[in-house]
């Protein structure tokens, strides 16, 4: 029997989400650029959010011009994620393959969407319309990863069952974090939870991971193949830096003998090996190619990943964010459902430090994919000396403290220099 959550404000929260969806279905955003007097009124979250839909949110570029994003355009949308999600329905409804979110944990943190700390009802009312809109953006075979700690895990799981249907729950993954928390009151918590739902579980394939991660994924004759260029070596032991350790096809007889050549020729004939020109001497490397479906295995439910600070240090952003999520974790989640879908769209509407954008870039770098990201982040000040130093050095802000969204954008730029030089993304503002 399914347990149904009840909390003060539940009816209003579901009604809001459904109304925003219905309003979006009624037609595209007006995009006239006019703000109603309700746009910046204060008050409670649901009171303000309840006014959404009266003028239909839309997206503007840096010149103040309404922008209708292309489907596979990399986006950073600055503003409240509820109107942003509604605005995205015009272009992305039913097109998102993966949603990854790491929402505020209801800790009372000032750098979140002003949750109330240990007020489960407020957190549930906050998340409900956002999850309803996220579901509308997902493809029929889309999945949502909801990453959080134990403060809201049980409540979030029941809420997710109600929104997606318990039959569409795909389980819970455990993220094993770096060790720490020696001052914990009872015991050291070394893990987080990642709850997973599908829009339609019957359409979702297995969650995959690579068996041989050092190899490269490529498309050969229309098929995705795992490519290993280091199959044959001239010898064992350490190699001097810059020296060629691969054994070229033309040198097999001299180094390994006729028997080894016959073995390689047989695998060339069967298609297990292919030859590729290598170097400047007209020789060929022996390359093993394996169909991607044979080079993958199902993901294990416990994922070990170090803290995200290790990812920020090489970007010159160390110490800017308190608890950034690890790129390898998000990359593994994204890749698990896009292993055979390298053109997928990935959405993160609690973008924070921008880990998801870098994870998408890293996944594309790994298999030459063209996945795109859609990030949403509020322009809240991040009161950190390191954050101020980064933005001051880049010359992008003269504010007392930079906003989180400014730093999200800066991380995307710096990560692109490493993973995807020349990558472009469009920064937009949501207009309510």
What spans do the regions from the language model cover?
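Glycine-rich adenosyl-nucleotide cofactor-binding module
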Residues: 65-87, 310-343, 362
């Amino acid at each position: 029997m399914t347990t149904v959550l009840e909390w003060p404000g539940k009816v209003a929260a579901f009604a809001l989400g459904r109304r925003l969806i219905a309003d979006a279905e009624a037609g595209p955003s007006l995009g006239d650029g006019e703000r109603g007097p309700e746009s910046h009124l204060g008050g409670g979250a649901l009171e303000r959010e309840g006014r959404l839909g009266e003028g239909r949110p839309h997206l503007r570029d840096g010149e103040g011009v309404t922008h209708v994003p292309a489907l596979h355009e990399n986006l950073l949308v600055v503003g409240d994620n509820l109107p942003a999600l509604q605005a995205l329905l015009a272009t992305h409804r039913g097109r998102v393959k993966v949603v990854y979110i790491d929402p505020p944990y209801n800790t009372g943190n000032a750098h979140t969407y002003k949750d109330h700390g240990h007020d489960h009802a407020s957190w549930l009312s906050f998340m409900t319309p956002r999850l309803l809109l996220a579901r509308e953006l997902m493809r029929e075979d889309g999945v949502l990863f909801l990453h959080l700690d134990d403060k809201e895990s049980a409540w979030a799981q029941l809420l997710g069952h109600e929104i997606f249907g318990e039959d569409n729950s795909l389980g819970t993954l455990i993220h094993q974090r770096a060790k720490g928390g020696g001052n914990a009151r009872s015991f050291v918590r070394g893990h987080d939870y990642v709850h997973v739902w599908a829009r339609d579980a019957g359409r979702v394939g297995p969650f995959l991971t690579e068996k041989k991660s050092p190899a490269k994924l490529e498309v050969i004759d229309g098929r995705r193949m795992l490519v290993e260029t280091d199959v044959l070596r001239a010898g064992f032991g350490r190699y001097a830096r810059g020296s060629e350790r691969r054994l070229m096809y033309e040198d097999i007889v001299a180094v390994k003998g006729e028997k080894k050549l016959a073995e390689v020729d047989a695998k060339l004939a069967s298609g297990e090996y292919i030859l590729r020109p290598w170097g400047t001497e007209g020789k060929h490397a022996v390359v093993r190619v394996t169909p991607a479906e044979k080079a993958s295995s199902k993901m294990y439910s416990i994922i070990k990943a170090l803290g995200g600070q290790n990812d920020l240090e090489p970007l010159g952003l160390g110490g800017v964010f308190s608890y950034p999520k690890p790129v390898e974790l998000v990359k593994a989640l994204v890749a698990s459902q896009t292993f055979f879908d390298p053109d997928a769209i990935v959405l993160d509407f609690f973008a924070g430090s921008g880990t998801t954008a870098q994870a998408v870039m890293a996944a594309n770098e790994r298999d030459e994919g063209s996945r795109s990201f859609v990030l949403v982040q509020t322009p809240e000040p991040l009161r950190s000396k390191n954050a101020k130093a980064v933005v001051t050095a880049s010359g992008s802000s003269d504010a007392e403290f930079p906003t989180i969204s400014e730093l999200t954008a800066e991380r995307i730029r710096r990560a692109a220099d490493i993973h995807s030089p020349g990558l472009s993304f469009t920064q937009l503002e949501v207009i309510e």
